[in-house]
Curated annotation (Swiss-Prot):
Homology family: Belongs to the glycosyltransferase 2 family. GalNAc-T subfamily.
UniProt organism field: Pongo abelii (Sumatran orangutan)
Name of the protein: N-acetylgalactosaminyltransferase 7
Annotated stretches, region: Catalytic subdomain A: 206-317
Function in brief: Glycopeptide transferase involved in O-linked oligosaccharide biosynthesis, which catalyzes the transfer of an N-acetyl-D-galactosamine residue to an already glycosylated peptide. In contrast to other proteins of the family, it does not act as a peptide transferase that transfers GalNAc onto serine or threonine residue on the protein receptor, but instead requires the prior addition of a GalNAc on a peptide before adding additional GalNAc moieties. Some peptide transferase activity is however not excluded, considering that its appropriate peptide substrate may remain unidentified.
Cytoplasmic-facing ranges: 1-6
Record text about domains: There are two conserved domains in the glycosyltransferase region: the N-terminal domain (domain A, also called GT1 motif), which is probably involved in manganese coordination and substrate binding and the C-terminal domain (domain B, also called Gal/GalNAc-T motif), which is probably involved in catalytic reaction and UDP-Gal binding. The ricin B-type lectin domain binds to GalNAc and contributes to the glycopeptide specificity.
Topological type in the membrane: Single-pass type II membrane protein
Record Gene3D superfamilies: 2.80.10.50, Spore Coat Polysaccharide Biosynthesis Protein SpsA, Chain A
Annotated spans, Catalytic subdomain B: 381-443
The protein's Enzyme Commission number: 2.4.1.41
Binding-site residues for substrate, renumbered to this chain: 247, 277, 412, 443
Amino acid sequence: MRLKIGFILRSLLVVGSFLGLVVLWSSLTPRPDDPSPLSRMREDRDVNDPMPNRGGNGLAPGEDRFKPVVPWPHVEGVEVDLESIRRKNKAKNEQEHHAGGDSQKDIMQRQYLTFKPQTFTYRDPVLRPGILGNFEPKEPEPPGVVGGPGEKAKPLVLGPEFKQAIQASIKEFGFNMVASDMISLDRSVNDLRQEECKYWHYDENLLTSSVVIVFHNEGWSTLMRTVHSVIKRTPRKYLAEIVLIDDFSNKEHLKEKLDEYIKLWNGLVKVFRNERREGLIQARSIGAQKAKLGQVLIYLDAHCEVAVNWYAPLVAPISKDRTICTVPLIDVINGNTYEIIPQGGGDEDGYARGAWDWSMLWKRVPLTPQEKRLRKTKTEPYRSPAMAGGLFAIEREFFFELGLYDPGLQIWGGENFEISYKIWQCGGKLLFVPCSRVGHIYRLEGWQGNPPPIYVGSSPTLKNYVRVVEVWWDEYKDYFYASRPESQALPYGDISELKKFREDHNCKSFKWFMEEIAYDITSHYPLPPKNVDWGEIRGFETAYCIDSMGKTNGGFVELGPCHRMGGNQLFRINEANQLMQYDQCLTKGADGSKVMITHCNLNEFKEWQYFKNLHRFTHIPSGKCLDRSEVLHQVFISNCDSSKTTQKWEMNNIHSV
């Protein structure tokens, strides 16, 4: 009997507990009239946060948590019309508004629902003049070799006996590897920062980072000096790993020797090898997938040297706001002597914003008064419309939420603009950081280059540009095609997922971007006028064309065999009467006769008129005609004579393929 009573009591207890849980669950279930769906979504995202405790070791779990918004690798499909989608959604939003739908605030907040909210608490940096910053070295940096060559970034000039070896190394690697190999991998460098940078104090609760370096057939000492400089000048608690992506190199020193060498760092440095040549762009996306330990991804080119206290200023803005992407100030390492100097241009402090002309060539323009007014001190980070692309830092998850790089971009070129536009137009910020400086070696003339693999096809960079403008420039893309008319018929693949990304994230228009962020671009590079005609300028019924021969800024154009490949033989004449090639104009030389090519803006060298039916170019200021000597291969102007066959020309369109 006692057994039955105990069994009954236990049964009643279980049933009662179950009913109590049901009542509690019902009380917590959201009702249809719940006023804060945004809050619930954010709470759910926090619960699923793969790095909920950022104040700890900051190690991210497996890569299955990170899925690109844009499918990767590249898939082909069909282009969609973003404007038609916008019009349809606009009509839908208006219907919701009239029907008592969401408030304008709710609609604006939707832009950020696909990005994880900021959960990391970080205090703003504090400037304390005269008090050395908490991340500044307390003692002068030790040299790699006392009194050694290249220490303190002083130039190393070799004698004439090294000339042949130097030329061979430049041809193979793009740098003077003879000098580089003589310089310590741990050499000391000069400090090019403003004095004020030394007195910034940063919250020590910084995010950790994975440094990603992509290389293809890089010289040994320039690559390893990049790695050594990062390890030497980065506080160890923040450096989660250095990830090297070997993009299908075939140099022997980048195989077993590299594998053995990096064992010195007990797993801190890792190398992953691509099974085929992917190109710099997609290799960086691969690097993001392989780098799993750091909260921030820092991309460096394979021939850099980070400077003193580079890390804290670069990562601090990201620690405060995860949608900020930062770029260090890039100094120039001379590829011959390895001296480090500030990059030219910019304002009186050497500060510049990243920009472009309408043919999509990278430019630097001085910091504007408006941007200066946004800062309290001259060493604070400042806004830039674009980055050069080789060196930057971005929160890892945010980069994945942005979809990494467009998977349709190939090898190199245009990716710096694509990621810049994507960040700005979709709710992020791009900041240049004056107190974080990194030296970079630029390839020297005479380098043989790294040709793209056969599977890529021709004109990969131009195709990249077309993809970028088709996705991000909206109606401004017409200005690109005015500057690069040969690209109008260029196939650029499927961009439907990229446009869907823009729509899903309520990314702003390029017009907004040009007015609010890149407002100074048109003052330096005015919108180009329409073209009257474009193509090769061929001597009428001949096989000879005008060729710039790669000359710029004052060189004379010549006559050469027509090759139908564009490039140095591609010109355009616009409604402003300018005869142009990229950002260069044709004009008469100092002798008043020979025709030269020189840099111009839209207010210069409005000198030419093309009479298509007459096959004639007239030089307006002189009233003379464009002429040629097929014997001397010269191009000049002379008195107009309708009987002279050498004054007859035709422009034939050339389309890139």
